[in-house]
Amino acid sequence: MNMKLSEIKNGNLSAEWAEKGYELPKFDIEAVKAKTHAEPTWVHFGAGNIFRAFPAAILNDALNTGKYDRGVIVAESFDYEIIDKAYRPYDNMSLLVCLKSTGEIEKKVVASVTESLKADYSFGEDWARLVEIFQNPSLQMISFTITEKGYSVAPADLERGLTPVLAMGKVTALLYERFKAGKLPLTVQSMDNCSHNGDKVKNAVHTYAAKWVEQGLVPAEFLAYVQDETKITFPWSMIDKITPRPDAKVQKMLADDGFEDNYTIVTEKHTFTAPFVNAEETQYLCIEDHYTNGRPPLELGGVLYCSRETVDKIEKMKVCTCLNPLHTAMSIYGCMLGYTLISAEMADEDLRAFIQKIGYIEAMPVVVDPGVLNPYEFIGAVINRRLPNPFMPDAPQRIATDTSQKLAIRFGETIKAYEARGLDKSNLILIPLVLAGYARYLKGIDDNGQAFEPSTDPLLAELQAIVAPLEVKEGEQDFSCLKKLYSRVDVFGVDLYAVGLGEKIESMAKELFAGPGAVRKTLHKYTLAR
């Protein structure tokens, strides 16, 4: 018997699915599809792996409870090949492979996506269907996973009138169709991993609408409509889940099971996709509960609805304390110690102790506690399940990208919080060690004395020029150039000398530069002492 996604629709299922641990939909797929076609409630823009692994899977879980009866319609506005190659041949179904830190995997067929559409005027039928959906009073929410770049507005696109090519322009054009259908209410929901994401969508939509009014293409009432929060809202959200490219190890496991849809697809635009999607087990989606026309009950699948202030606190907890600072510490030292996998770093006793103590001892005293998520449970999941996960092929080199843009929020905010609360900054030892490590990292020489290429960064050449006089060697040398680095408020969020940490960091940097092996020796010394 074939184990193919197309067989599920037919209901002609072999016992092999259950025997091999595949969880199948518990709802009537065709009934949900018909109901959604007639009365759509949710359109999602961005057909990539994160959508299938998270929002679509959450809705699948909600449908499995029997308490909801509508699916989600996916629209792709950038890489149309995804629709042709990863959705339609499989009746819009996919296999979610959940990768656990224990090495176990869970396999679940996701059948909550009822239609897949190419969001562009050149695809006449698809665009007409999107217009029809946006004109339907039943539509409650549109959402996005299109990356932060997807919310950009280009001057040239604003001059294209009502047929723009960028995602936000197309969405604004569809909102105009909804406006013409009777100024119908709708919630416009970003689910991308960037702070205050709702404002990014709002600003883009308002920019297009204002320009079109100025050009005389739409009435002024349209701008008033998208600015009226009784009609259109742009809630904030915090999303957190790692969804890597389709993994060869997972592909082999599925092939060994007899699951036939196990190949990977690379589009002309270099999107890596497949009929299956592999992702980590841990996931968080917290959404500001500000809807104008109702919403799908995604809490049935684990979404946390809360206030805007709480979403902001959750974001700060993650970015300033419980995840991102640990990532950056591991990336700087991982690159210098020759690691290429974050999971491998977690088997290094010095590095594991380093990030544990940064999180629990130094950052946690000033953590922003959102109340609805426990910071200790969150960081515990990061250290014990997420970072050691052997299925997550994340590299310190990837995380080290744009480090100069990240240090202020990931460490500067903690230092500022110590200042604001009058806490003793002499208790900060390992956070200064991270910042001292940054000067050593900028040299591009690893702990064995071999050259490595630091990750791309807009300030890389400028900051490397500051540390250029320094050498990785034993003996005396002039470290006065570091003053120019560690007084950079734009990089660190504070003048580290003004807050009394500059000299401590300089002293640590001197130890890190003291020849091959000095990085390991210094890391071990301070981590053990802490």
Map each language-model feature to its residues.
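Substrate/ligand-engaging "lid" and interaction regions
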Residues: 2-45, 49-530
